[in-house]
């Protein structure tokens, strides 16, 4: 049986191997054709595998790494001192063809810089963007990018993000002629920073992009657009704010009806409502769409939330599997030359 092999930065994230190792076992249990290379401290990793199913361990290999890139390290310094780190070795496994994709919950800036340096961007792409696919109110999906890879973006980068997001929505999500919008502080054409207005001018005159104009942050989950484009600073703040509100909403649902002074029938009604609402809105749980693809590279790199729990990191692993199976870089590369506006 041919296995799909992924490299995991087992030491990255807020909880390191205490999350990545059990998440890896969960992913292996759910996918019999998956093999994982766990990069990190062998002693720490193996101590967490003592009670693991021996059959799962046959598809798991520990790759030693002496060092870890700290989550608060400056990207430039982290990249210079990256030799021997779990993140860099995981990326090297992809570069050398030993793994089909890399998954890391580590330092976003360092991951971006190392991936660009080692795996290289596709032709026509200046800088990769972090992209995720989130559910919306129309029971459909919305592609959102950039989510933090590039804090500052010029108009050219925003246009490139729009192209990549459009290709992703059509080729991978399966949306015909996807609508593309720029995230802005208003829908009027005069609103926004110069780079946003300049990008809008280009997208309006790009016939292969179904550009619909500006949308605001409160439109992110409405389904008004299939692709939402913004710079990494705005995207990161927007996504995390949205996730925080959703988590609060779900936690309030969970705690409702649990008061000690309530009668049994009120508690029963409360629990019934919880199940109904959870079924209706459970798909919005951020854990279910953890894992942002570093879009625009020649290989596949998935960035998990640093604070991801076991369930969420397992979802990020599954995101990597799907990206490999759907040949995301190849599909984007195949359409970039025809779609991307030519630069002077």
Swiss-Prot record:
GO cellular component, one term: cytoplasm
One of the record's GO molecular function terms: phosphate:acyl-[acyl carrier protein] acyltransferase activity
Catalysis: reaction(s): a fatty acyl-[ACP] + phosphate = an acyl phosphate + holo-[ACP]
Domain of life where this protein originates: Bacteria
EC number from the UniProt entry: 2.3.1.274
Pathway annotation from the record: Lipid metabolism; phospholipid metabolism
Keywords: Cytoplasm, Lipid biosynthesis, Lipid metabolism, Phospholipid biosynthesis, Phospholipid metabolism, Transferase
Subcellular location: Cytoplasm
Transmembrane segment boundaries: none
A Pfam family annotated for this UniProt entry: FA_synthesis
UniProt-listed InterPro entries: FA_synthesis, Phospholipid_synth_PlsX-like
Protein's GO biological process: fatty acid biosynthetic process; phospholipid biosynthetic process
UniProt function note: Catalyzes the reversible formation of acyl-phosphate (acyl-PO(4)) from acyl-[acyl-carrier-protein] (acyl-ACP). This enzyme utilizes acyl-ACP as fatty acyl donor, but not acyl-CoA.
UniProt subunit comment: Homodimer. Probably interacts with PlsY.
Family matches, as NCBIfam families: plsX
Family that this chain belongs to: Belongs to the PlsX family.
Name under which the protein is recorded: Phosphate acyltransferase
Source species: Yersinia enterocolitica serotype O:8 / biotype 1B (strain NCTC 13174 / 8081)
